[in-house]
Amino acid sequence: MNFVSWVEHHRRSIMVLAVALAIAGVFAIAKMPYGVYPVISFPRVRIEIDAGTRPAQQQLFDVTAPVETALRQIPHALNVESTTSRGSTEIFVDFPWGTDMNLAQLGVEGAMSQMVPSLPAGTSYDVIQMLPNVIMPFSSYSLTSDSVSQVDLLRLAQYQIAPMLMGIKGISYVGTLGGDQKEVEVHLNPAQLKAFGLTVDDVSNAITAANTLEGIGHLQDHDLLYLMFANNGLTGLKSIRDITLQTAQHGIVRLADLGTVTDGVVPRWYLVVDQGKPSVEINVYQQSSADVVSLQDQVQKDLASFMKTQPKAIHLVKWYDQTQLVASSVAAVQEGIVIGLILAGLVVLYFLRNWRATAVAMIIVPMAVTITSLVLYVLGMSFNMMTLGGLAASIGLLIDDVIVMIEQIARRAGVPGLENPEATVLEAAKEFLKPLTGSSLATIVIFIPLAFLSGVTGAFFKYLSLTMAVALIISYLLTAFVAPIFARSMIDFKKWHDPSHEKPGAMRRLHGRLLDGALRRPIFLPIGVLLLLGIGYVAMQHTGSGFLPKMDEGGFVFNYQTNPGTSLAETNVQLATVEKIIKENKYVAAFSRRTGAGLGGDLNEPNQGDIYVRLIDPSKRPNIWKVMDQIDDQVTNEVPGVNFGTDQLLTDNIGDMVGRPEPIVINLAAKNPAVLNDVANNVANAISNIRGIDPSSVNNGVTPAGDALEVQVNNAAATLNGMTANDVQTQVNDYLKGTVVTQYIGEAGDVGIRVKVDSPTSGQLRQDQLENLPISAPNGRVFPLKAVAKVVFVAGQPEITRANLQQIVQVTGEVSGRDLGSTAAAVQRLLNKPGTLPPGVTYTLGGQFKQQQQAQRGMIGVFTAAMVAEIILLLFLYEELLLPIIIIATSVISVSAVFVGLWITGIELNITAMMGMVMILGIGTEMAVFYVSEYQTLCETMPRREALHEAALNRLRPILMSVVAMVLALLPLGAAVSGSGDQMQQPLAVAIIAGIIVQLPMVLLAMPVAIGLTLPRSERRG
């Protein structure tokens, strides 16, 4: 049974199956989860270690170095990077792409658990797998109030809002940041203690002894078993004040007689501010497979209902919403399909002048989209910026398939005077099956090498390539088997005749004259090719290079750092001016600030932090980069003491997943690490003068943890007073920090009781008062601290950064007004210049530039592999070598036009644009296959020279129709009419549009000439 008979016999089954799959696809679309990015397992683990308060150098020796050594021994661990500060360490462990990260995380946790016994007492750690949905929330809110305390706001967030939201299916975690935690502060009067002959330890022990709640046994009576409790727990301020102590000379004394007992809050060295007011931040995280859009809707609905039950004095503000990007991507696909279909339909209507023929194309393309969605659903994928972008970018290719089939059917079955045109429809489809199969394979085969692309590029773009490959396969099947059945059923060929059988139109006549001239004067071929390549080369020189496409996310992060050692309070004062600038910008909708903390949970000092700024609707403002520049310039001019950088959150987030997020990262290493800080300062000053480097964003990588005051006890003097160094240290601690001696159960959890000793002077202690702190000896003698110790100023010790056990310093900078590639090249030239780096100091570049270089090398490999795959396919199709070489040559030459398109539109050559280059190779080959297949068919009935000419004329209309339709279908994506939803795929669309426009004359003019040159000399002239 041949193709025609088989399709004829199963036409009803084919129709029902296609319609059923399309309907199932509609239901799949309704059930598909939505997200910003696909679920990607980044091969990176973060370990946060807290060992109390200790100098950075001691933390390195006691904690960081041994832990690094243990982690480096984990199987498959590639890199171990660490940052060590006072009592804190942050370590990153990198693994190869494709590693089972659940097992890798277990390996890290196992190594850490084995290390804990050998670490300083009290050391705690947390192991975090670097996943976007773990590191960053999809939605964030702030609670503020002018009358409700921060303690009550935190309780509201922790004990009411968080549990409510955790009840929503798909929510993995709800975190809070900011607010105050209640504690009771016992301030002891040193004079009263001396008068009653008591010590701080006496008071602490009495409080602890008075707060007991423990089981003391069981009692059986009356056939029942009772559990016995000793319940002498404290209940509040009154019960604490009434605690009694026994004295030798004064009998029993109440705690209230020794000082004051008041409500207080746990000290914290970070701030969270929303719209300039102290706030409690609520961050909502989703499970990896959850539908972020429906989650956000439910979260918003539940919070709106909850806030109706709260006092009006409490305000809830949403300052981050990731689903806005998803909505924009969905809108981009919808607009792409609708606009693309309408424009492509107009193209079909213009050339064929038949509404029903146009309707066939308008039906097949949406069916291909819905069935593709069904396949994605079955594969467990989600709608995200990659899969949605793949659907939007594939619209032009889907239209291309059905257009050439409809044109073939129209040309064969629309012949005037044909007795049985309906019977010719399937015959025409059968004739076209081989070129259609070859052309479809030419496009599909380029996606095979992309499956082997590694790194962050492969992780993201494999979803886009898989989506497009599935769409093209579905489109091929619908075009080959369903479109002919629709065409035969819907088009009345007895009443309608193909316009191509009428008098040749102006386009065909023009093409014929150009083709005749090219065939007669083949010398114009190399001239034209060289001219095209020359223009492409010039465009390439003027086209910048980048990593990922620039995308307006609707908000950005303002990372800041005041001078090292600046107190939290002073940093807050300086940032008030920055907040005022942001608040007064008319394009800002909301903002939230963290000082001493960060969005991604990174290691931060009290003089560091970030501000997330959410902008108003994109339709009511300039693009985000102009707004960022406005704020940057204003802060630079008005707040000179603040070092800062701006970046968009998701871009910054992706950078954190694979390394440093900054575009320029210079890793400096030296045989003598002591010279690194000075070298880093010099390098930072030098790169600040490079065009493209934002001077305000340059960070020398030297991050002092703030100055310190060391209490150095004279052991001999302490011994003479009957004390040890630890005794002196403890009493100083009682003045400064105090000690939490016990906890009692309050209304909303445990409440700590902190015991402190009031300083001799009222208010906060000053540096010059420390040496006069009264120290009490065991014999009752009181003397100033300076009698047994001296207070020494210690300049701030920088954080210590290491990579694979080697100390480094990382100088970073943001790029502005210039592309990343040329800026990094300028940095390299500077660093390679003699005298910039002293002998023994080496450097490597990291950050986004490193990722860009890795991605470009990978894409070059993909392009080469795709070219080889195309040649192999063409060899199977034609079983000769010259034709594949000519076809691939025309496609490669068309790729040069991509640089022209990027230059004209001002878009950088990034990974998405390079993806478009690879696709041009396939699309160009597809167009060439249409021509060569027609040429080979005509060679059976006419001389080859004549067949070259006639095949080009015959394929003019279908190729022109497909090119025009594809350009128009991709135009909304290339123009980014939907804003951020289009911007990720905009370079790809521009690359394809530029490439296929040039490929049109390459196939219809250059290729006939090139093939003609391979003919025997006797056949070259017709």
Task: List PLM regions with ranges.
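Solvent-exposed, membrane-proximal periplasmic/extracellular interface segments of envelope transport
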Residues: 3, 8, 58-130, 191-212, ...
